[in-house]
Amino acid sequence: MDELYTEDQRMIRDAARAFATEVLAPNAAQWDRDAHLPDAVVAQLGELGLLGMIVPQELGGAYTDYVAYALAMEEIAAGDAACATMMSVHNSVGCGPILGFGTPTQKERWLADMAAGRTIGAFCLTEPQAGSEAHNLRTRAELRDGKWVLNGAKQFVTNGQRAGIAIVFAVTDPDAGKRGISAFLVPTDTPGFVVGKPEKKMGIRASDTCPITFENCAIPEENLLGARGEGLKIALSNLEGGRIGIAAQALGIARAAFDKARRYAGERVQFGKPLAEHQAIQQKLADMATQINAARLLVHHAAKLRTAGLPCLSEASQAKLFASEMAERVCSDAIQIHGGYGYLADYEVERHYRDARITQIYEGTSEVQRMVIARQL
């Protein structure tokens, strides 16, 4: 496979793989128990350039292309899916909106620090009553005396505790429907930006997920991101890259579970021979490997289109849909191959299963992906 990638892509993949193998994988189980990703790990991601993967080098980033991003995301997710969640959200929907719609001043103010990991980004779109129905927002932003004043609540905000800057979507014109939503850059130390208690989750526990409340949170007028009324456009335009990132994350989780299952099947002896010599287990492993490789092809195809600046709404959704559902199947089979031991935390495949499940939900549920794909047919 190496011959299919450029030297830069291989270099980025190998750096991410080394970090995942040496730092993430040995500690992921403990971070899962602690429900906390150490700040030092985030700083190391920044030093490696993994937090500025879509930011051009002239703006302080390490952008090569989206295939390199997908390769790095797969490796980080194989080491620790929770770390990959933080990295994906920060890159795709943290840096992405500023890169695509920010003014030169906004880009200069935020992107270099974000790419270096000095400032982490969050994306505040989902609300308690508005998940897949993203346009049904209740958070309001009113222009008063040269400042935008935000009031409302957001739900399931990844990096909610860690972020220094949040991309916030709020209604600025209640009578304009979908065209009445705008996007804002809100520093998280702004008075009235209130971070709630982190959610207790099934998986990706080391990634902080918090509710956020805006209580007369006032920001300068120039913190409007893009044009007034462009909020939904900004949100949706960055979901393509976000879905490629999550698809690559699902791919990495599946690969980690598969590697453990393959190794265990070679070591565990039943009925006088290793599990891997039993036809039933061989067939499971063959199906798992095939599904993983098929998902990788879909992910990299979407990544190539994104790199070329070509439309990839359907392709990104196909990659995310297939990879996320594949990951749950592969992780389930990995548990089955381990038998009763697979149900124990000591063997870690149960954590991969828990982590995989969210990839069918965030950045658009599987049901939404099918709707998107069907509309493009």
Residue locations for each model-derived region?
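Short Ser/Thr-interspersed hydrophobic loop/turn segments at strand-loop and sheet-helix junctions
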Residues: G49, M73-A77, A170, V186-P191, ...
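Alpha-helical interface subdomain recognition
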Residues: M1-V89, F101-Q106, D113, G117-R118, ...
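Flexible, small-/acidic-enriched active-site or ligand-binding loops
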Residues: N136, D189-P220
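Short glycine/proline-enriched turns and hinge-like loops at secondary-structure junctions
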Residues: T64, E133-H135, N159-G164, G177-G180, ...
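Helix-loop "lid/cap" segments that line or gate small-molecule binding pockets
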Residues: S92-G100
